[in-house]
Structures are given as structure tokens and as C-alpha cells.
Amino acid sequence: MKVISSIQALRDQLRGQNRVAFVPTMGNLHEGHLSLMRLARQHGDPVVASIFVNRLQFGPNEDFDKYPRTLQDDIEKLQSEGVYVLFAPTESDMYPVPQEYRVDPPHDLGDILEGEFRPGFFKGVCTVVMKLFCCVQPRVAVFGKKDYQQLMIVRRMAKQFALPVDIIPAETIRAEDGLALSSRNRYLGETERAEAPVLYKTLHEVRDTVLGGDGVDLLAVEADALARLQARGWKPDYVSIRKQDNLQPPTREEFAAGAPLVVLTAAKLGATRLIDNLEI
């Protein structure tokens, strides 16, 4: 596996490759990331991964400098998965001059849910993903469903800019007790780790209630889930039932007609903020 930091060197290495499958990451890789590499290999060849901790998507109260950087360990994991190239640019490689042009997602998708609680986050995500697509020029790119809103935003961005890349969704990888794998899990203490699977259990309870029959009050279901998490010591930002296609709340008519739904949540357990979702 070649490790490349320069955009020009990356383009030279990939010249003539027209079936590149790309997996962008911020490093600190775990089994969930590695599953994305395996899925990428099913859709293209060669597989290219990137590791770049993107300052643009960190808010003023989010510590960019403390984000875990484990490059050597990540390199070994990617080598074991047969990745062809790791693009690991420095900040000066990626942004040799200040990034004055940004990609701003539409408000109806970028300023809700995660976007409401992390203002500017998706603008930073879209900007770096667009730039990575320009650097790598993949035929397919794999994004995990764990970051469901990010997947929807990137998919819409690719479509509206007519980018020649297919966005492939990857199922969330979970621990045996249901906790979604995440780089943030390392911050959970022993007691918190034992409590953490309750978040996924709560999503299942929401789904079971929604599927339980006609006349379900979705707002009441959301409020009940929030209250139950709060009673256990969580600090939830949201539990929200949305349509899968555009992440808008379903109307009564859409719900009655069986519109595909997803329940999404973000909540703090101690100092660790976890996100998860479950399709209904």
C-alpha cells in the first residue's frame, strides 16, 4: 500500500484508473471503517482510503486538537485489508491557501438534526468531501449509514453537482450488545459502556411502537423516548422520526401511506456524545 500526502502525487498514482472505490475517513479506524473497505472492494478496484482530520467541520466548542490521531496503527489496518493507496494529506497539503469557497448544503437538510446542534458541521463536511472527490476522482464512494444524515447530504450533493461518482451506503457495524461502533466509544468509562447499548434499544422501542398500529402519535413517541433516556441520566439532543428520502417529518397522510421512515438520535452519556439511527 502506498501512503501519499500530496494531491499531485495522488493524481499521478491514480492516472488511468477508472474504477476507483473510495472511502474517506478521519482515521482512528475500527472494524466499522474496515467493513467499508471490504464493501468498496465489491464495487470497484483499486480501493483508495483517505485519512484527514478536517478542521472545517469542527465547531468552536469542539476540540479539533484532541481528536485521536493514530496514523501508524491505521496504516497497518488498511494494509491488512488490501487498500491500494492511503491518501493522508497534511492540513497544508489539503488547504495550501485558506479555503474561501465552501459547499453549503440546503437548509432543509443541513440545518436540521445534527446541523441544528453542530452549526456549520455539514458545510465543512461537504467542502472537504467535494475536494476529496476532486483529488481522488472515484467511480464509487462508500459512506456508512451510521452517519445517516451525512450520507443523505453527500448523496444529494453528488446528484445535484452531477458528480461522476456513485454513493454506496454501508450498514452500521455494531458490538454484540448493539452499540454502534464509533471512534467516540473509546471515551466511555466502564459504567457508561455498560449503559451505552440503551440508545440502540430505545430506537428499537420507537420502531416497535411506530409499527404497532394505526393512529400512532409520532411526536408523543419521540417525547416518550426522550423522557426515558433522560430518566436514565442521558442528555439527549433529539430523538426524531423522519422520512428516509429527505429527513423531513412525515405528514399524517405520508405516515398512513407507509412512507419509509428512520428514527435518528443523538445523546450525551457523561461527556461522550453518541449518535445512532434505525430504519423503520
Swiss-Prot record:
Subcellular localization(s) per the UniProt record: Cytoplasm
Binding annotation for (R)-pantoate: Q57, Q150
GO biological process: pantothenate biosynthetic process
Pathway involvement of the protein, from the record: Cofactor biosynthesis; (R)-pantothenate biosynthesis; (R)-pantothenate from (R)-pantoate and beta-alanine: step 1/1
Subunit text: Homodimer.
UniProt record similarity statement: Belongs to the pantothenate synthetase family.
Note: The reaction proceeds by a bi uni uni bi ping pong mechanism.
Protein name: Pantothenate synthetase
Natural source organism: Cupriavidus metallidurans (strain ATCC 43123 / DSM 2839 / NBRC 102507 / CH34) (Ralstonia metallidurans)
